[in-house]
Amino acid sequence: MNDLPRAELPGSGSPNPESLILASGSPRRAQLLSAAGYEFSVQPASDSAECGICSRETAPEMVARLAYRKAADVVARIDDGLVLAADTVASCVGNILGKPHNRDHAEEMLRLLSGRNHDVFTGVCLWSRRDEKFVVDVVRTRLQMSDLTDQQLTEHLDSLRWDGKAGAFGYQDGNDWLKVIGNDSESNVVGLPMERLAELLENFEQNAEKITTPTIDSIESSDSSCS
């Protein structure tokens, strides 16, 4: 990946700026932030913040909703801080591919992706607990996967590098059968679009929306209609 951009946090020039909190236990997202030079703490969202796929949702809608829920979950448990949450899925021929449940599920995903172009979507939510403002955005990266041989598929499954990764692959693993199309964000495939994150931070005060209920309770009713 190219050099990762970094932006100053909102209010960084004030005497008491908010600190950045990563609402994710993903080591890959933490590594991206560290590589870009951000200082942050980690407070993962609870499992209940992820309710899965709603039948009427598109992939972009899903990752936006889950990023919001994850941020809201952490915001409800802190007194101060700028919360960063994200959710990533792959999408291929109308199928939304999250993290595989097991080896068989990973193989099913990889056979679907093999020889096809597909998309990776990451929803990003920044939420200021102090100001009760948030912004949500979604970034898409187009990928091309070569036709996987049985040997390549078996080697990848045996390596366990599919575990915990949307679409059962990790771009950062350097597989020569997986390429980003054009100039789309590589870090987005890893789990956090660093270029867009820098833009969101730079423009947070201008673009963030005010919210009056900093908990996930306000969106539970809409989630209950998922089926």
From Swiss-Prot:
Keyword entries, A-Z: Cytoplasm, Hydrolase, Nucleotide metabolism
Reactions mediated catalytically: dTTP + H2O = dTMP + diphosphate + H(+); UTP + H2O = UMP + diphosphate + H(+)
GO molecular function: dTTP diphosphatase activity; nucleoside triphosphate diphosphatase activity; UTP diphosphatase activity
Alphabetized InterPro entries for the sequence: ITPase-like_fam, Maf-like
UniProt-annotated catalytic positions: 87 (proton acceptor)
Region annotated Disordered, chain positions: 1-21
Functional summary from the UniProt entry: Nucleoside triphosphate pyrophosphatase that hydrolyzes dTTP and UTP. May have a dual role in cell division arrest and in preventing the incorporation of modified nucleotides into cellular nucleic acids.
Protein name: dTTP/UTP pyrophosphatase
